[in-house]
Design a protein with these regions (language model features):
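Helix-coil boundary/capping segments in enzymes
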Residues: 1-275
């Protein structure tokens, strides 16, 4: 069985409310999520189950509490509807509004109890804030209580204006922001506070496993109890690329096959030299 853990979709109402989300960095236009289209793609490439998520990095950008909640509900309702109609083909990651923690926790409870969703997708930062900060503790408490996985996906970073030329934000900054966000989660002791936390790092975790020895350094006084490496090795890493085969082998040699998940990054994904 092939399960694609990195399968993005854009409901029509979501695109209407965030017009800038209608095109990716290449200028390729997205259209409203269509179940049949996605199922046809899955049949074409032999994918048995697609785990639906949204890139979702723009939701908190304006700091608008009501709009953030509305956008998340649109995403979550759409994905839950797809799962209800095709329960053996679609699974779902919820997106939570991080402007207000009461809204965040309430929406998570709704997604798990009413919508029967299967985990949570969060961007690497929300409007420039990283989710290891103390203000997001209610999110972590609710996530841990639900016992389902957290999928971390790159988003535009606070320093992006320095990287826009030549689209370097897409090529380098996004993997860098994944490395930053996940490292901060580890160093902040999140895995110590929530020992049963299951985390999926998209795009093979950015540069984490390339720089594992450096990430073990104790400068800056990380509060995690164990060597940072021991936490990074508990994380699951998806293959959304393009990724060179040598990098996948490095990940395999470092964490083993059980920690590697298939991800295609549809509809964004593009092949590379080894794809």
């Amino acid at each position: 069985m092939i399960i694609d853990t990195h399968f993005h979709a854009f409901p029509g109402k979501f695109l209407e409310l965030i017009p800038e989300a209608q095109n990716d960095v290449r200028g390729v236009g997205f259209h409203a999520f269509d179940h049949r289209e996605y199922l046809n793609v899955m049949e074409q490439y032999g994918i048995d189950i697609g785990v639906l998520s949204n890139t979702g990095g723009r939701i908190e950008k304006a700091g608008d509490r009501a709009k953030a909640l509305e956008l998340c509900k649109i995403l979550n309702d759409s994905f839950a509807d797809a799962h209800a109609k095709y329960p053996h083909r679609f699974k779902t990651f919820a997106r939570l509004p991080m402007v207000d923690m009461d809204d965040c926790v309430a929406e998570l409870e709704r997604c798990y109890k009413d919508l029967k969703m299967h985990g949570v997708m969060m961007p690497t930062n929300v409007a420039g804030k990283y989710i290891d900060e103390p203000q997001f503790k209610p999110f972590w408490d609710a996530l841990a209580a639900g016992g389902k996985p957290l999928f971390i996906h790159p988003a535009n970073a606070p320093c992006q204006s320095n990287w826009d030329k030549y689209s370097l934000h897409q090529k380098i900054l996004w993997p860098t922001d994944s490395t930053l966000a996940i490292s901060r989660i580890v160093y902040a002791g999140i895995f110590d506070h929530y020992p049963n936390l299951k985390m999926i790092a998209s795009h093979l975790g950015g540069m984490i496993l390339l720089y594992l020895d450096r990430l073990n350094w104790r400068e800056g006084k990380p509060v995690c109890r164990e060597e940072p490496e021991s936490y990074f090795e508990k994380i699951y890493y998806d293959t959304a690329g393009p990724i060179r085969a040598a990098f996948i082998k490095l990940v395999y040699d470092t964490v083993g096959a059980d920690q590697i998940l298939f991800g295609a990054d549809y509809p964004h994904g593009r092949g590379g030299k080894d794809d």
